[in-house]
Regions:
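Residue-level detector of flexible, active-site-proximal loop/helix-junction positions
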Residues: 27, 48, 80, 93, ...
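Amphipathic alpha-helical segments enriched in hydrophobic/aromatic residues interleaved with Lys/Arg
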Residues: 99-137
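Generic protein-terminus/edge-of-domain signal
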Residues: 1-59, 65, 72, 99, ...
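Ligand-binding loop in jelly-roll beta-barrel domains
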Residues: 71-99
Length: 137
């Protein structure tokens, strides 16, 4: 029998995960902001928040995700009546395909939301650091 190799194309190759958190913010939470030399995405699992990317504020609600490129200043604040639950993942990636995500936010499909949930489940089984404490790196 002859075996045929199928070469895999790596459009986006994440080199390292820096942080991965899932937590519930207080209703009146405000984070004044930061910037760093790696990518970060913020996914709203529940609630409504305002997100700053450099000088632009955007409102995100349940199911929305935003990407912050390296060295982009970003901040968040809770703006809804309920405490928001957020997933924050930061990572290093030099893939040119990541340019697609610069200054972009999206509403995820149910299948994509399920994938985010799977990432959290896998992370809880893989990493020893608590995911619900934002200051833990």
């Amino acid at each position: 029998m002859t075996y045929i190799k199928t070469k895999l194309k790596r459009s986006i190759d994440i080199d390292a995960i820096i942080t991965l958190h899932y937590f519930e913010y207080m209703k009146n939470f405000e984070f004044k902001g930061e910037s760093h030399n790696f990518w970060e995405f913020l996914y709203v699992d529940k609630g409504t928040i305002a997100v700053r990317a450099d000088d632009t504020w955007t409102t995100l609600k349940t199911g929305d995700i935003i990407f912050h490129q390296p060295n982009e200043f970003h901040a968040i604040k809770s703006i809804g009546k309920d405490s928001p639950n957020l997933v924050v993942m930061s990572f290093t990636c030099d893939s040119p395909a990541m340019d697609f995500f610069i200054r972009r936010n999206f509403t995820l499909s149910m299948e994509e939301r399920s994938m985010i949930s799977q990432i959290i489940i896998e992370a809880r089984q893989t990493f020893s650091t608590p995911m619900h404490i934002p200051s833990v790196e």
